[in-house]
């Protein structure tokens, strides 16, 4: 029976390949090559596609059933690779890969930009009070924490205390740095009011970037002590490496510093120029809608670019790792999961 199912699945895949320009479908595999930046960029554009937020319950069930039919070799004739890739995209966007439960819409990766943009606009509002600075930094870190938790690796039980620790560390560092920098700018008498206002607009970036690093370190410091799994080219477990863990945390931290840079730096620069135009000076009510559009554009570009910097499964030479790792495999390189 297993041979029959495999033959049927292969025949269906062959028929799909002949009727579609899409690459041959591979269940559970990315549609685009992950070895190049462009391939990863295309892959993450699919993951954050906000159109999947509007998928109906019926369409989700159809997508899941189509993938089940493919898996068991019972795929109906005429199904194309494009339909299979689309079904997998829908399932991965909505259902958690480990629990198979629906992820709450605001915390899906496809909802990160639509639900995160209003927070970015709030972070960049001019003339903020102490209370508003604290509120927007807290809301931003709360949203990030919920996204991280909703998309966590659920194959192994993880204590809630670890997530709470990372969340509190991120909130405290973000709020303290934002408030501290705002106070310093306000007390800097050598700046003109206009210069002071311009500088204050850039305060959210160092606050958010430092909070992101703090969050990564607090939530994953255990990996530095215990190491992370490294695999050979065939996917076999070679061992656990602390050096690979350092590389993984460094890559993740760098990604989380790069991500807010265009989101929180470009809009203030663009808005400082747009505010001088005759249109916005004559119609100040347009300032907030225009800033929202600028933030949305920056967010939409920055997110896929930042998370495409490094492959999800990063490669490292065994000669750079612990001697016991190098001795445990004949492979010249091994791979590790860097995490989100």
From Swiss-Prot:
Its organism's taxonomic lineage begins at: Eukaryota, Metazoa, Chordata, Craniata, Vertebrata
Catalyzed reaction equations: citrate(in) = citrate(out)
Query: Which protein is depicted?
Result: Sideroflexin-5
Topology of the protein relative to the lipid bilayer: Multi-pass membrane protein
Gene Ontology BP terms: amino acid transport; citrate transport; mitochondrial transmembrane transport; positive regulation of cold-induced thermogenesis
| Function according to Swiss-Prot or TrEMBL | Mitochondrial amino-acid transporter. Transports citrate. Does not act as a serine transporter: not able to mediate transport of serine into mitochondria. In brown adipose tissue, plays a role in the regulation of UCP1-dependent thermogenesis probably by supporting mitochondrial glycerol-3-phosphate utilization.
Q: Where in the cell is it found?
A: Mitochondrion inner membrane
Membrane-traversing stretches: 103-123, 163-183, 254-274, 287-307
**Which controlled-vocabulary keywords does the entry list?**
Amino-acid transport, Membrane, Mitochondrion, Mitochondrion inner membrane, Transmembrane, Transmembrane helix, Transport
User: Gene Ontology cellular component?
Assistant: mitochondrial inner membrane; mitochondrion
Name the family the entry cites.
Answer: Belongs to the sideroflexin family.
- Tissue specificity of this protein: Primarily expressed in the brain.
What's one Pfam family the UniProt record gives for this protein?
SFXNs
- Its predominant location is mitochondrion
């Amino acid at each position: 029976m297993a041979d029959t199912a495999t033959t049927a699945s292969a025949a269906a895949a062959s028929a799909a390949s002949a009727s579609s320009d899409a690459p041959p479908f591979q269940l559970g595999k990315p549609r685009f090559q992950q070895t190049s930046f462009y391939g990863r960029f295309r892959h993450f554009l699919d993951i954050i596609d906000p159109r999947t937020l509007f998928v109906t319950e019926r369409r989700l069930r159809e997508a899941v059933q189509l993938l089940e039919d493919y898996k068991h070799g019972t795929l109906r004739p005429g199904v194309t690779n494009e339909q299979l890739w689309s079904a997998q995209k829908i399932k991965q966007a909505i259902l958690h890969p480990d629990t198979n439960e629906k992820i709450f819409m605001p915390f899906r990766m496809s909802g990160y930009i639509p639900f995160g943009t209003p927070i970015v606009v709030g972070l960049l509002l001019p003339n903020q009070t102490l209370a508003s600075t604290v509120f927007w930094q807290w809301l931003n870190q709360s949203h990030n924490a919920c996204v991280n938790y909703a998309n966590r690796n659920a194959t192994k039980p993880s204590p809630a205390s670890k997530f709470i620790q990372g969340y509190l560390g991120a909130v405290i560092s973000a709020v303290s740095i934002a408030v501290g920098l705002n106070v310093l700018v306000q007390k800097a008498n050598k700046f003109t009011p206009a210069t002071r206002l311009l500088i204050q607009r850039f305060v959210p970036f160092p606050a958010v970037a430092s909070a992101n690093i703090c969050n990564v370190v607090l939530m994953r410091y255990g990996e530095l002590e215990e190491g992370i799994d490294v695999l050979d080219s065939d996917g076999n477990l070679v061992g656990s490496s602390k050096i690979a863990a350092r590389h993984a945390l460094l890559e993740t931290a760098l990604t989380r510093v790069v991500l807010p840079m265009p989101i929180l730096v470009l809009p203030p620069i663009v808005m400082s120029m747009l505010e001088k135009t005759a249109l916005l000076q004559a119609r100040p009510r347009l300032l907030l809608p225009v800033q929202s559009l600028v933030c949305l554009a920056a967010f939409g570009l920055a997110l896929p670019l930042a998370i495409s910097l490094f492959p999800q499964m990063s490669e490292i030479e065994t000669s750079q790792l612990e001697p016991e790792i190098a001795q445990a495999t004949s492979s010249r390189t091994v791979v590790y999961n860097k995490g989100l």
